[in-house]
A protein has these predicted regions:
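Juxtamembrane and boundary regions of transmembrane helices in multi-pass small-molecule transporters
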Residues: 63-69, 73, 85-88, 105-154
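Re-entrant/interfacial helical elements at transmembrane boundaries that shape
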Residues: 14-15, 48-59, 72, 86-100, ...
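Intrinsically disordered, low-complexity non-transmembrane regions of multi-pass membrane transporters
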Residues: 16, 20-23, 130-166, 199-203, ...
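Transmembrane alpha-helix interface/packing and boundary motifs in multi-pass membrane proteins
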Residues: 36-45, 76-88, 174-178
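Flexible hinge motifs at transmembrane-helix junctions and intramembrane kinks/re-entrant loops
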Residues: 156, 160, 168-188, 203-204
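Membrane-embedded alpha-helical segments and adjacent helix-loop junctions characteristic
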Residues: 1-67, 211-251
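Hydrophobic alpha-helical transmembrane segments
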Residues: 27-35, 49, 72-73, 108-112, ...
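Transmembrane helix-bundle signature of multi-pass membrane transporters/permeases
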Residues: 35-38, 56, 73-83, 111-116, ...
Length: 251
């Protein structure tokens, strides 16, 4: 799904639209990109979000004549926070949520509020650290000189399909407790739907899947399963319990 969105130009279009909305002013771009990375990472892997945002940030920084490092650095922090807020934000969240039987709502009710508070702190912190540097930068350029968001869309049909599929994925994930669908089923369904609707680029999309990461997690699960079956994890848990004196706070 994410590769399909990227190929259709969704992420570049979104970034340029937001930059245009704040009239390409450096400080507003700095803040809105932090918020955008947080929101996107709630539903898309944070590393993927940063890869797409960083590319557009570098493009805008060249046009605005500003240092892209503070913006990208803040995006990384906010993307990590966004990924921690929901059950589908990052692979560890999916593992924890599914193993404990949490729904999307139950997971976000435990982590979402903490993530939001942390977001406010991070935004204020980075603003205080970099607002003077960024405020002193930025070239005065005619609006017509900035990249047009519409030019980011490589194919209007594929772009529309990608937007619909993304919204469908969000709706299914949020309502999976009511529908009875598992997170694994939703992910597989969305992937198949993307390949069917973008069948012309199916081979290219499949080639861009991060198989190394998938194999890593498969191997990791095998190792953890072996440790669990042999009782090693139980022994480690017992040792931690003894060392902490069964104190919940220390554990």
């Amino acid at each position: 799904m994410v590769e399909g969105m990227g190929k259709a130009g969704f992420f570049r279009w979104l970034c340029l639209e937001i930059a245009k909305l704040v009239k390409y002013r450096t400080i507003p771009v700095f803040i809105t990109f932090m918020l955008m990375s947080f929101v996107l990472a709630m539903f898309i892997d944070s590393i993927t979000v940063i890869l797409f945002l960083a590319a557009v940030t570098l493009e805008l920084a060249q046009t605005l004549k500003c240092n892209p490092v503070p913006i990208i650095l803040s995006e990384i922090f906010c993307a990590n926070l966004g990924g921690s807020a929901t059950m589908c934000g990052d692979p560890p969240n999916i593992i924890i949520g599914t193993s404990l039987g949490y729904t999307f709502g139950e997971f976000i009710s435990n982590t979402g509020f903490i993530a939001l508070i942390s977001l406010v702190v991070i935004v204020i912190y980075f603003y205080l650290c970099f607002h003077k540097e960024l405020a002193g930068q930025g070239a005065v350029v005619q609006i017509t000189s900035y990249p047009d968001p519409k030019e980011a869309i490589t194919d209007k049909g594929e772009f529309a399909k990608s937007c619909v599929i993304f919204l469908l994925a969000v709706v299914l994930l949020v309502t999976h407790a009511q529908t009875g669908l598992t997170v694994a089923f939703i992910g597989t369904f969305i992937a198949i739907l993307t390949l069917v609707t973008q069948y012309k680029d199916a081979k290219e999309l499949l080639a861009k899947v991060d198989y190394k990461t998938l194999l890593f997690f498969i191997g990791l699960f095998v190792v953890v399963g072996g440790l669990e079956q042999t009782g090693v994890l139980e022994e480690i848990a017992g040792l931690i319990s003894k060392l902490s004196g069964s104190n919940g706070m220390l554990m």
